[in-house]
Regions:
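Short, Lys/Arg-rich N-terminal segment immediately upstream of the first membrane anchor
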Residues: 1-5
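A cross-family detector of function-defining hotspots
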Residues: 25-34, 59-224
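Glycine-centered tight-turn and secondary-structure capping sites
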Residues: 55-56
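Acidic/histidine-rich, surface-exposed loop or edge segments in extracytoplasmic proteins
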Residues: 39-50, 136-146
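Short, flexible active-site loop motifs that bind/organize anionic cofactors or intermediates
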Residues: 49-52, 151
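Hydrophobic membrane-insertion alpha-helices, especially the h-region
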Residues: 6-26
């Protein structure tokens, strides 16, 4: 399975609460890497966020880091692509409850074998969800994380992101939904904003950023 298919899915009161819970009030968080803007680069083409190095750290490490048990799943898209994910329903980072989704870098043959051994299949709005065997769940936890999606529980004003991340290299608006993607290729980061929705931050290794951006460019337009 290609990396592209795996990789592919004034401050208001709430924004002030986000800042307060994350950094400014009442003081520094216990861990600086609890913050979504604390991005490290162990190497030029790698990224480390929330204490996890994408492309190296595995799902087991994420469970230890977040002190929560993940929910592993296998998804089949309408065009037949298989994607392995683990989902954290609620993690507490810098005092802010959030959801985290990890896409797992599993070889295509392994994904197909897991699919064939699946216990149950349910139809979702975006394809099919396969319940994995206990053995495959344990195996899934040993493969590297290819992308991390962070979903904070509060709506956040754009000014917060500008202050913490700076100006994006590009802004791309989806034609169909109107959502706007702020792109930071040097950090492998795509921040999705718009329509009054809560933000979504997706991190990938910078070397794979083109694979994330390509579908956006095909289905959207670059804003001036």
């Amino acid at each position: 399975m290609s990396a592209e298919s795996k990789i592919y899915w004034g401050v208001g009161i709430l924004s002030a609460l986000f800042i307060a819970g994350s950094l400014l009030v009442p003081g520094e968080p216990k861990r600086s890497d609890d913050l979504p803007w604390h991005i490290e680069h162990p190497t030029r083409d790698s990224v480390r966020v929330f204490g996890l190095t994408l492309g190296e750290s595995v799902a087991n490490e994420a469970e230890l880091r977040f002190k929560e048990e993940a929910i592993p799943s296998l998804f089949k898209s309408p065009d037949g692509k298989l994607i392995a994910e683990v989902f954290f329903e609620q993690v507490n980072l810098a005092g802010l409850p959030s959801k985290v989704v990890l896409t797992i870098d599993v070889p295509e043959k392994e994904l197909q074998d897991m699919y064939e051994r699946g216990l149950r299949m349910a139809t979702t709005g975006s394809g099919k969800k396969i319940t994995l065997t206990p053995e495959d769940i344990a195996h899934l936890r040993t493969w590297p994380i290819s992308s991390l999606t962070y979903l904070p529980s509060l709506r956040v004003d754009e000014s917060v992101f500008l202050k913490r991340f700076g100006q994006p290299a590009q802004r791309v608006q989806e034609t169909k939904s109107g959502l706007i993607h702020w792109l930071y290729p040097q950090d492998g980061l795509d921040i999705t904003l718009g329509n009054g929705e809560k933000p979504l931050l997706q991190y990938v290794p910078p070397r794979n950023f083109d694979l994330l951006v390509r579908p956006l460019m095909a289905n959207g337009e670059v804003l001036k």
